[in-house]
UniProtKB/Swiss-Prot annotation:
This is Photosystem I reaction center subunit IV B, chloroplastic. The gene is PSAE2. Residues 1-46 form a transit peptide. 2 isoforms may exist. With or without the N-terminal alanine. It comes from Arabidopsis thaliana (Mouse-ear cress). Stabilizes the interaction between PsaC and the PSI core, assists the docking of the ferredoxin to PSI and interacts with ferredoxin-NADP oxidoreductase. Residues 50-87 are annotated as: Disordered. It is found in: Plastid, Chloroplast thylakoid membrane. Coiled coil: none annotated. Keywords: Chloroplast, Membrane, Photosynthesis, Photosystem I, Plastid, Thylakoid, Transit peptide. GO terms for cellular component: chloroplast; chloroplast envelope; chloroplast thylakoid; chloroplast thylakoid membrane; mitochondrion; photosystem I reaction center; thylakoid. Residues 51-77 have a biased composition (Low complexity).
Length: 145
């Protein structure tokens, strides 16, 4: 490798001998970083693991397992959506809110049951900090028809 290219990139090759762990498997890992200023720059990562050759008994059992139909787990039914639908009008019931008893529209509802304030509401009027949206709990909003 020329001295100029050594300053702009490097290649790392790691071969871990099997005698260290006492096992019989071999693994090879190659990582290379090349200079970023060339148009052909790329990152190459290659990992290979050699497995012991399969015996005739394990070979026949693998074909039997492949021939058997794979069981697909039954998909869970989706739970009903939490909170008001997106775009619906809601009245704010949080007393300390700037928009208390005002009506705003729902922007989004987080469907995670662990979220404390899942309902994002946008208002036509901005508050003292020039903000027009806020998050509310499910019990702090009431749908308006």
């Amino acid at each position: 490798m020329a001295m100029t290219s050594a300053a702009t990139g490097f290649i790392l090759t790691a071969n871990v001998p099997a005698a260290i762990g006492g096992g019989s498997s071999k693994s090879t890992t190659i990582v290379s970083f090349l200079p970023m200023r060339s148009f052909g720059s790329r990152l190459v990562v290659r990992a290979a693991e050699d497995t012991p050759p399969a015996t005739a008994s394990s070979d026949s059992s693998s074909t039997t397992a492949a021939a058997a139909p794979a069981k697909v787990p039954a998909a869970k039914a989706k739970p009903p959506p939490i909170g008001p639908k997106r775009g619906s009008k809601v009245k704010i019931l949080r007393k300390e809110s700037y928009w208390y008893k005002n009506v705003g529209s729902v922007v989004a509802v987080d469907q995670d049951p662990k979220t404390r304030y899942p309902v994002v509401v946008r208002f036509a009027k901005v508050n003292y900090a020039n903000i027009s949206t806020n998050n509310y709990a499910l019990d702090e909003v009431e749908e308006v028809k």
